């Protein structure tokens, strides 16, 4: 989302040409900016003064969510920065963001036409697409309907209420065995390494109806690709913000295209197989559900927007990538917080022992009876804020917010980290305290406080897989806490410093775990 550095240009003549051309572009943009008429009664956006060509990149540093939070204290909840040659409006504060994304949702529902966005899922991405409103809404409705249909699919045996529950319970049980094996062989384990593969398997099961061995090269390759995608997108593509760089060779862009090509090739192969074996009376997974809804749309003469089969590949690709990365990151952070706060880990175990027992696995139906676990997950999402920004938004027309004029096609950043750490909303926001979400007697979660946490976006672009993701995180965690006691390695300090990216990961480390004895309490 930001420029980390400008690419090195070796030839002096090329450098001089680049400077000259970018200077011309810069002068043009500056003149255009100052020629923009501000409607009567509205104000020009405040913000730091940009440097020529690179804008405010240097002020953003390696942790832009912190830098932009600091700027919001100086300039307010609506201000403008410049990244390269592109003006960007930054929104902070829960009420301001709610006003923009919900009350003025249509005005801020676009996606900026960033150069790199054109190549994500070959331009067919639901999350990153700059499609016109009607087309985008039709695709979103299709994806949402498919997810809703999938959520009602029953498990293969009566003990599971749905397919999601079956996938997570089976994979959770296998994950515990894998961690025990690692403990026996090595005395410790890398939590992210094992969690990420287990979550990928659940996503593969839900999207594609298949499960892999943890050392399967295709699965390991997908995990690696997803990690690379997060790093590349998180570090930013200079061509998104300095347009002339689109025409110059770029190692970053070459790698970006390679990653997207591999993902698309993998999903295209599976979608093709699903078309070959599709049976409308036997919906097996999300891909089948998408095909089913897509076929219904083709038969609907009243449908204004027909959906091409290629769009299914883009939607499946989005659901796989987003669901896999978000859930695995949430779970790995959760384990880190369990180790960092042993007293909280014991309270969670006690709650599960009291409300679920130790003779069966926790299920989705147990969720209302485990308020402290729900509060713990909410505090993970708030305190870590591992999704510091939403995917950038874009204004669809000239608009205003908090009295400031914002032109059409302006790129907009939503600072979720600031909202989740705003001292005006949260008492002692830097402290990790799940109890902040509980009622006075601890018997239930305060829903209004829980809704203040921003992790999945808001409004028309809110993540459509949020409910599935939350249920998956809950169920995985309940299973792990019921069976395992997570511990640090003696003498090693736990480093909770996030590493910036599209999703912020904790630094890779090793932990220990022991099986819970049934008579432990």
Swiss-Prot record:
Functional note: Cytochromes P450 are a group of heme-thiolate monooxygenases. They oxidize a variety of structurally unrelated compounds, including steroids, fatty acids, and xenobiotics.
Q: Which UniProt keywords apply?
A: Endoplasmic reticulum, Heme, Iron, Membrane, Metal-binding, Microsome, Monooxygenase, Oxidoreductase
Q: Which reaction does it catalyse?
A: an organic molecule + reduced [NADPH--hemoprotein reductase] + O2 = an alcohol + oxidized [NADPH--hemoprotein reductase] + H2O + H(+)
**Can the keyword Metal-binding be found in this entry's annotation?**
yes
**What is the protein name given in its UniProt record?**
Cytochrome P450 1A1
Per its UniProt record, the required cofactor names are: heme
Species name: Limanda limanda (Common dab)
- GO MF terms held by the record: heme binding; iron ion binding; steroid 17-alpha-monooxygenase activity
GO BP annotations listed: hormone biosynthetic process; progesterone metabolic process
The lineage's top-level taxon is Eukaryota
State the family named in the UniProt similarity comment for this chain.
Answer: Belongs to the cytochrome P450 family.
Q: Where in the cell is it found?
A: Endoplasmic reticulum membrane; Microsome membrane
Membrane topology per the entry is: Peripheral membrane protein
Q: Which GO terms describe its cellular component?
A: endoplasmic reticulum membrane
The record lists heme as bound by 463
Residues involved in substrate binding: 229
Pfam families assigned: p450 (PF00067)
Enzyme class comes to oxidoreductase
Q: What is its EC number?
A: 1.14.14.1
InterPro entries in alphabetical order: Cyt_P450, Cyt_P450_CS, Cyt_P450_E_grp-I, Cyt_P450_E_grp-I_CYP1, Cyt_P450_sf
């Amino acid at each position: 989302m930001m420029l980390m550095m400008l690419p090195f240009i070796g030839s002096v003549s090329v450098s001089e040409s680049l400077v000259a051309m970018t200077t011309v572009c810069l002068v043009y943009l500056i003149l255009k900016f100052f020629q923009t008429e501000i409607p009567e009664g509205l104000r020009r956006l405040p913000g730091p003064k940009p440097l020529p060509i690179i804008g405010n990149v240097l002020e953003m540093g390696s942790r832009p969510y912190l830098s932009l939070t600091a700027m919001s204290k100086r300039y307010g909840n609506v201000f403008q920065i410049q990244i390269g040659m592109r003006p960007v409006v930054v929104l902070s504060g829960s009420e301001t963001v709610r006003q923009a994304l919900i009350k003025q949702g249509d005005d801020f529902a676009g996606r900026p036409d960033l150069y790199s966005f054109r190549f994500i899922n070959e331009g067919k991405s639901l999350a990153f697409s700059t499609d016109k409103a009607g087309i985008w809404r039709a695709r979103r409705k299709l994806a949402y309907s498919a997810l809703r249909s999938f959520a009602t699919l029953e498990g293969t045996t009566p003990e599971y209420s749905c397919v999601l529950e079956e996938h997570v319970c089976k994979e959770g049980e296998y994950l515990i065995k894998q961690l025990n094996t690692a403990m026996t062989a090595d005395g410790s384990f890398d939590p992210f390494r094992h969690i990420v593969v287990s979550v990928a398997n659940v996503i593969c099961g839900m999207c594609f109806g298949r499960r892999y061995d943890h050392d399967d090269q295709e699965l390991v390759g997908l995990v690696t690709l997803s990690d690379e995608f997060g790093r590349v997108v998180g570090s930013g593509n200079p061509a998104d913000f300095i347009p002339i760089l689109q025409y110059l060779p770029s190692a970053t862009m070459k790698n970006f295209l390679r990653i997207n090509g591999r993902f698309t090739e993998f999903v295209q192969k599976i979608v093709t197989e699903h078309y070959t074996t599709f049976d409308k009376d036997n919906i097996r997974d999300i891909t089948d559900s998408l095909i089913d809804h897509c076929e219904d749309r083709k038969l609907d003469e009243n449908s204004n927007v027909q959906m091409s089969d290629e769009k299914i590949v883009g939607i499946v690709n989005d659901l796989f990538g987003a669901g896999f990365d978000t859930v695995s990151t949430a779970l790995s952070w959760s384990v880190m917080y369990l180790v960092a706060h042993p007293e909280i880990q014991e309270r969670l175990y006690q709650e599960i022992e009291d409300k679920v027992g130790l003779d069966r696995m926790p299920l989705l139906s147990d969720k209302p009876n485990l308020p402290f676990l729900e509060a713990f997950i909410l505090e993970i999402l708030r305190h870590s804020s591992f999704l510091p920004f939403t995917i950038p938004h874009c204004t669809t027309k000239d608009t205003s917010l908090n009295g400031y004029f914002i032109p059409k096609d302006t790129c907009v950043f939503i600072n979720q980290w600031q909202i989740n750490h705003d001292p005006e909303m949260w008492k002692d926001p830097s402290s990790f305290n799940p109890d902040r979400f509980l009622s006075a007697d601890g018997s239930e979660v305060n829903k209004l406080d829980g809704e203040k946490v921003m992790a999945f976006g808001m409004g028309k672009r809110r993540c459509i897989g949020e409910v599935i993701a939350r249920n998956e995180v809950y169920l995985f965690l309940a299973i792990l806490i019921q069976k395992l006691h997570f511990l640090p390695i003696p003498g090693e300090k736990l480093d909770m410093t996030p590493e910036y990216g599209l999703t912020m990961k904790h630094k890779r480390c090793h932990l220990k775990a022991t099986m819970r004895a049934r008579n432990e309490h």
